[in-house]
Amino acid sequence: MQSPTLLTFDLPPESRAMSVPFPQRRFSRVSRTQMVRFPDSALAWLQDLAHLTPTDFSLKDEVRNTQSHHLDSAWTSGTVKLRQKPVSFVSAGYSEPLKLLEDIEQDKVPPGEATESKADDMDITTVDVNLNVSAEAVIEKTTLVELDSAAKGKMVLSNSTSQDNPSSETPQEQAQDLFFFDVSGDKAIRDKHRAVHPPPLVPIRKPSLAESDSSEEVILFRGRAGNAKTVPQSNFVVRNGVATNTTTAITPTGDKTKPTAAEETSLRDDPEVIPVAREKRAGRQRSRSKASKIPKTDEDDEEDAILADYIANMSANPEDDFISDQLRSFNNRRDLGGDNFALNLGSGDENDMPVVEDLSGDEQQAESSGSGLSDADEDNGDENDEADEDDDMDADMDDEGLARLLAKQEELGLGSDELVLIPESFGVSKRGAKKGGQKRATPSSFAKSANASSVADAFDDLDLADWTVPVPRKRRSKQPPNFNISDSEIEAKLKLDWSRDRERKKERKLARESLRGQGLLDKNASPDDLRVKYPVGLRLEDFKTELVAFLISSDERLEFPPLDKHGRMVLHQLALKFNVKSQSTGKGTTRRPVLYRSKRTITFKPHQITEATRQVDGAARRVGRKYFPRADVAGPRGDTPRDGFRGSAHVSVKALVLREGEVVGASAPELGQENKGRAMLEKMGWSKGMALGALENKGILEPVAQVVKKSKAGLGRT
């Protein structure tokens, strides 16, 4: 409890004017639970003090006191920043709105009834002065006012809970020095005073007549034991001229110990009842045997409270009785000295043989009751329920799962007489548990498993290969697989299709390797890239086509594949005639020309493609070279067939010469309707799908395939 607070100020003897002697306090309410003691010299002053009203202390006085209090504080000094100041929280006290309501109801009682009810209590006179500034703080504090004529006109206010020593003065001196002024006891005197000095009207909020909405309702959670805090309250009671000090404790209690309204009224009005302070907190006393035990931390208490709330909520649901019973047994085990983290739900570990789910209701009741049953009774019960347990296990496992487990046991070298490897989802067989010698689930059996030892023995007998040695992968044969088909024609066709598929895969692999070397296998690679579009080289027609597309489009940049020095020069000359900026970038075989659009570049609309093509053809008319191979593609150089134009050029024969195993003419397109030979055959009655020859002598439907062979030569070479 806090120490007493003393407030001392000078009171001039000659001053009889009405003033407030408390510069930072304000009288808010006066009750009849405390006492004021004063000598003869201050009687007139206290009479004026008793008739104080809240309006005597104006806002001007409040501003003056506040300004003088905060003028030289650290907040306005400027030496300390606001963010560096600590934040101190001041408690507003313990609120008791019910007592305020009782006082309001008592004020409404007629004066006659109040005089009769207080006739027997005139010997006890108490005055309560509330010194709390906050309106929410309604804790009644003890205020003892001592006025001594020998103290040179000084007044001391003491807030204390210590008892006065009645033996220090004689009864005659006490009778001469003590005077009591009842402010609220006599209703008639107070009504007369109010008629002369009416108190200010305080507006009272009327209850709303509208029905409350469920969305605006506030549900208060009472919480746990944290709210059961006592607030000490000191009351000075004077009986027969002797002042005594008693301390009461405000303790919220449950519904079972809460007294009724009639009992509270009778106890409050009874003058013989004096509240007695409880010096010790209510709680369970610990025995000396548990004094040496390690105290529980706050986290443990919080976990216990959470678990207690969970059990209370689960107990309301009848479907969760089993879980509630198990959790209740868990709490009992912890109280008996068990581990705080040991949760025993009646089942063992995942490798243990006994399972709670496999037990019947009678067996669970027998185990939970803890009654002493003989081993013979347990054996008889196990033998009677053995068939039922096996049926339940067989029902849980389907045929597919059982076959898989049996196959796994055969791989491990185990017999199929007893099922050993059983997963958790299928439950656990009790037959193996009884054969292993376990009749009851004991703590020692939780750490051992008969199945684990059986599996370990089975693995010890196995001759496993050395897994550290890498197993070489079987190389795929280049020969076609054996299809094992009786029909030779179908088998030959399958082998031919297989070989063609292998060739196509090989070609795609070579193409990917080429593109990977050029960096064209990126995720952002565009199929319109000229390096992808022309993997081998470009013709003069390709130059003109790409230049026309660049002039019509709105692209700012066009990059060509790597070309030799003469090819780059030809492209620069064509670009210069249309005011297109051209520049070569890269080194060695990767040097390539790049075209850039400028402000002076001649542009064409999409509908002007004919005009653009005509101008580009006129600009490339004097170019004698017709083919421009890529400089970054390596390959043998040879003579190229003449295409009817002047001049010749040496190009890469990689795109013109067939590879090993390719079929000649396999990629040749079908002859169209404009072909003269096909038109002549169609006039003679031939159509697609018909064989050539007479009706009796049909020719072949498929042409004779010619496969390129370079590795071997001569007859009989395959």
Curated annotation (Swiss-Prot):
**Which residues fall in a compositionally biased region of kind Basic and acidic residues?**
265-282
Q: Which organism is it from?
A: Podospora anserina
List all Acidic residues biased stretches.
Answer: 375-400
Give the protein's biological function: May be involved in splicing.
Q: Tell me where it resides.
A: Cytoplasm; Nucleus
Its Gene Ontology molecular function terms?
nucleic acid binding
Q: Which SUPFAM superfamilies match?
A: R3H domain
Q: Which residues form the R3H domain?
A: 537-599
A biological-process GO annotation: RNA splicing
Q: What is its main location?
A: cytoplasm
Gene assigned in the entry: SQS1
> Which residue stretches does the UniProt record annotate as biased composition, category Polar residues?
442-452
Mind listing the UniProt keywords for this protein, alphabetically? Answer: Cytoplasm, mRNA processing, mRNA splicing, Nucleus
**This protein's name:** Protein SQS1
Q: Does the keyword Transmembrane helix apply?
A: no
Q: Name one GO cellular component term.
A: nucleus
Q: Which CDD domains match?
A: R3H_G-patch
InterPro entries the record matches: G_patch_dom, R3H_dom, R3H_dom_sf, R3H_G-patch, Splicing_assoc_domain
